[in-house]
């Protein structure tokens, strides 16, 4: 195996190519910066990224480089939000679990995959480490795989291995992995977390996201037993439950005894904890996010967030009005899978108000807002004022339930909107 310089490695990229880039906290920035250095030689290169976190903006997503590179996202990484606002980048609306199908079916042809992998083992296998998500299927379908080998990348079990013979060009890219601090839940988030935790039974299998509310839920599960983890993102928050044996994965049907995820977001401690740890399995999103796999786990619990919820139960989670700030991600995949699970439950958790004092329970979604979870899938909605169950409720009764967990300062306005929309049907409920 011969190591090339980064600029030599990306020399295999041609004009018109489509590149799939590994994400999570292991974006191969060495390769992307080298690619950008070739901008004068390249035209119409599409760069597709999934969820990712990096403090530096994507180097290829600049106005002056638009003839060379087109930035496309499945889920808008934090370092491409400015480019999205300015129209430099665009998004492909897609359920995350279906992205590998788009690659494998050829609907989105993949020419090149950029990876950030571990050192090869004695048999020549590199690990994708903390991010299989869309990278595994991207590399599987790519005509050319280019990788930066990173001494900081842990080795994980599951999908994430690739032999050096499958990699066309390799360079060194010893970048410390991005760390994501564990947020301390606020008082409001703690109240929301308690409402949700009270609905989670012993023996449940958890899909839980990232942020203050998910950590508040985790903190409230300290007296539970025999929980399982089948999720998209594994975070530091679950480690105390694993170390105490509260998450033991003993009742799961999919990978019993093991915690399953598709990517990892956390601290150096978490990355080191997972290194060569057979208690964790990392699979690509075609597996982790498949509702037919999720439903096999008993009491599957899908816990997700939202930007706003309207009075019929439509849930916006990817945009603020017309401005897309994230993506569908795995919310639909897990909400649907949990709904099909025996004893499963789906939760949407959000504060009742924004930091600017605007209600998140609204009469109608903002113009241009995307519906990530439809009113037909909505089950439990929780704010700091309570939790309500919407499934099978008629629209007027849904409105009444949602108003009850809105901030008290906006309830009268929401009631007037409900009367205007539902008429006597709403009035008869009072």
Where would I find each of the regions flagged by the language model?
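Conserved alpha/beta enzyme-core scaffold
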Residues: 1-430
